[in-house]
Amino acid sequence: MESTPTMQDHVRNAAPEQSATATRTASEQIVAEVGAWPGVVVDTGELGEVAFAVGRREIGHVHGDHAAHFSFPRRVWTELRADGRIEHHPVFPDATQGPAARRIASDADVRDVIELFRINYDRVTAARG
């Protein structure tokens, strides 16, 4: 019987000391990068998602290696949507601010998801002072 990976498995598997030839999954790459930013806490959410937070503010989460979800203010959401970087969140398909989704299907998507996390990280840390 195969078990679902835990947050500790993701963190352990994303350790920087892995050999250069080791292939990391999308979520392992994202956990390794975003989880290394000052003040970021990585945890497993109620639905098994890997969530990233600064203080009490979630900056986004990933569902396995295939999707990332975020929340952005209207101006940022509109710009990112116009640029094709985010889509409507599947639970909130009519939203024009707040919930957003990004599919992860390639290395370029992984890099952009990390950049989207950085947008929220910079926003949250700037607000905290």
Show where each model-derived region lies:
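Generic signal for short, ordered secondary-structure residues
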Residues: 9, 13, 34-35, 59, ...
